[in-house]
UniProtKB/Swiss-Prot annotation:
Name of this protein: RNA-binding protein MEX3B
Lineage, highest ranks first: Eukaryota, Metazoa, Chordata, Craniata, Vertebrata
PROSITE patterns: KH_TYPE_1, ZF_RING_2
Tissue: Highest levels found in fetal brain and testis. Detected in the adult intestinal epithelium, specifically in goblet cell at protein level.
Organism from which the protein derives: Homo sapiens (Human)
Residues the record lists as Phosphoserine modifications: 4, 288, 462
Domain of life, source organism: Eukaryota
Compositional bias annotation for Gly residues: 13-26
ZnF start-end (RING-type): 518-558
Main location: nucleus
GO cellular component: cytosol; nucleoplasm; P-body
GO biological process, one term: protein autophosphorylation
């Protein structure tokens, strides 16, 4: 080490001087050389003690580091000091030879600087200077914009308003766009000022401007989200089910004025509109009944009050549920091509044979049963007209006037002819091949023979157990409209269903006096009629054989036949 070298030189010089004076062993030249060296060292100020302290303190000074916290006013100042992708803070670290830890979002805006004392002091001065510079720039910018009126708002310009447009948190960046291009475009197009929400705040855009411009900006924001995400934002939380098409409240149905089973399946009138706050995704969402287990009334039954070809195409497999069927006459001519007219009250009327509104059926309306009235295994009550009551074994009860013939099969048009497009859900048994079953959840519409039927509209043949189900009596006056019905006991169809009588005995129990013979075989009793012509001149076997032909037609009028129905008289 230099300090030890200088100390040895000093000790040797003093010792040599003493020896020279005492013994005279050293020459004068050596003493002069040593003295000259000591003088040079003394001129430099590096004697033995000072040199030792200087060289010993230097490594200790290099190893000492310090850490200091430098606060700034806000997180905006932090962003300004750090710079884009940290370019400014990297340059400051290299300039001051320090390590500067930047604060993360959500923490206090404090920089932590580590390094030598003078380097830390330099970095601290740079950070504070940059923060003050940014504060001055922001203050002057706010002052100039406030004087120029560039920041619109209710306090500055009269007539302007501010609204809040709430969007999902995940689409905030979508609305802002790359480098704010989308939100700037919306501001320029609508002449509004839009404040973008911060990351740690609610996803609400504050739009300021004239009322019409504010509305335009809101629509632009929602349209942009819809364009990029494929949907429209629901403004209220209660419309989530409506937006997804998975539920429908009972308010639409009960709003039509109906109550009970009929109103649950009724189609809303045009006066019923969706909630104002709702922005529907689809045009077929006005009356979705998916939560009730049936198809949408709007989608499959006309889609409004005007019939259309597309709606007729969709009617092949859909029909209203049985509890809402009431074959009543009403003035609504909203015919959907399936023989029914659906009204707000949950009723259905059968159109005239030629589809003209002036030839509507003239039978009396059949009101819906009261709540709590049995729907299955019920019998008709005795009507005020004096007609006897009788059980009817079919999918629905007839409320139409009977024909003038001795048989009491009924067609809504009256007489011996039936409408060609009427859905005869009353006393109808579809022609099916033996052993086949195709249950449906709703009454059959006009279809090809054998396409399927309601699970209650079971085919009733003259075999044991063929006694069918008795549906509810939809009117008290039905007995008067079915002349010649044989009085029965009060047990109704439940007794007939539990009986194990043979086919001949069960069919003979339904016969009445003066019955006719089949016009084909002239052996069996006339118990069947053909659809749609309505000629009731055949037994069930002959009627089935007619329908099972390759080109079935009525032997009387040579009209194409779709099915055979059994007459209960």
């Amino acid at each position: 080490m230099p300090s030890s070298l200088f100390a040895d030189l000093e000790r040797n010089g003093s010792g040599g001087g003493g020896g020279g004076s005492s013994g005279g062993g050293e020459t004068l030249d050596d003493q002069r050389a040593l003295q000259l060296a000591l003088d040079q060292l003394s001129l430099l100020g590096l004697d033995s003690d000072e040199g030792a302290s200087l060289y010993d303190s230097e490594p200790r000074k290099k190893s000492v580091n310090m850490t200091e916290c430098v606060p700034v006013p806000s997180s905006e100042h932090v962003a300004e000091i750090v710079g884009r992708q940290g370019c400014k803070i990297k340059a400051l670290r290299a300039k001051t030879n320090t390590y500067i830890k930047t604060p993360v979002r959500g923490e206090e805006p404090v920089f932590v600087v580590t390094g030598r004392k003078e380097d830390v002091a330099m970095a601290r001065r740079e950070i504070i200077s940059a923060a003050e510079h940014f504060s001055m720039i922001r203050a002057s910018r706010n002052k100039n914009t406030a004087l120029n009126g560039a920041v619109p708002g209710p306090p500055n310009l009269p007539g302007q308003t501010t609204i809040q447009v709430r969007v999902p948190y995940r689409v905030v960046g979508l609305v802002v766009g790359p480098k704010g291009a989308t939100i700037k475009r919306i501001q320029q197009q609508t002449h509004t000022y839009i404040v973008t929400p911060s990351r740690d705040k609610e996803p609400v855009f504050e739009v300021t401007g004239m009322p019409e411009n504010v509305d335009r900006a809101r629509e632009e924001i929602e349209a942009h989200i819809a364009l990029r995400t494929g949907g429209i934002i629901e403004l209220t939380d209660e419309n989530d089910f409506h937006a997804n098409g998975t539920d429908v409240g009972f308010d639409l149905h009960h709003g039509s004025g109906g109550s009970g089973p009929g109103s649950l399946w009724s189609k809303p009138t045009p006066s019923i509109t969706p909630t104002p706050g709702r922005k529907p995704f689809s045009s077929y969402r006005n009356d979705s009944s998916s939560s009730l287990g049936s198809a949408s009334t709007d989608s499959y039954f006309g889609g409004g009050t005007s019939s259309s070809a597309a709606a007729t195409q969709r009617l092949a497999d859909y029909s209203p549920p049985s509890p809402a069927l009431s074959f009543a006459h009403n003035g609504n001519n909203n015919n959907n091509g399936n023989g029914y007219t659906y009204t707000a009250g949950g009723e259905a009327s059968v159109p005239s044979p030629d589809g003209c509104p002036e030839l509507q059926p003239t039978f009396d309306p059949a009101p819906a049963p009261p709540p709590g009235a049995p729907l299955i295994w019920a019998q008709f009550e005795r009507s005020p007209g004096g007609g006897p009551a009788a059980p009817v074994s079919s999918s629905c009860s007839s409320s139409a006037s009977s024909s003038a013939s001795s048989s009491s099969v009924v067609f809504p048009g009256g007489g011996a002819s039936a409408p060609s497009n009427a859905n005869l859900g009353l006393l109808v048994h579809r022609r099916l091949h033996p052993g086949t079953s195709c249950p449906r959840l709703s009454p059959p519409l006009h279809m090809a023979p054998g396409a399927g039927e309601h699970h209650l509209a079971r085919r009733v043949r003259s075999d044991p157990g063929g006694g069918g189900l008795a549906y509810a009596a939809y009117a008290n006056g039905l007995g008067a409209q079915l002349p010649g019905l044989q009085p029965s006991d009060t047990s109704g169809s439940s007794s007939s269903s539990s009986s194990s009588s043979s086919s001949s005995s069960s069919s003979s129990g339904l016969r009445r006096k003066g019955s006719r013979d089949c016009s084909v075989c002239f052996e069996s009793e006339v118990i069947a009629a053909l659809v749609p012509c309505g000629h009731n001149l055949f037994c069930m076997e002959c009627a089935n054989r007619i329908c099972e032909k390759s080109e079935p037609e009525c032997p009387v009028c040579h009209t194409a036949v779709t099915q055979a129905i059994r007459i209960f008289s």
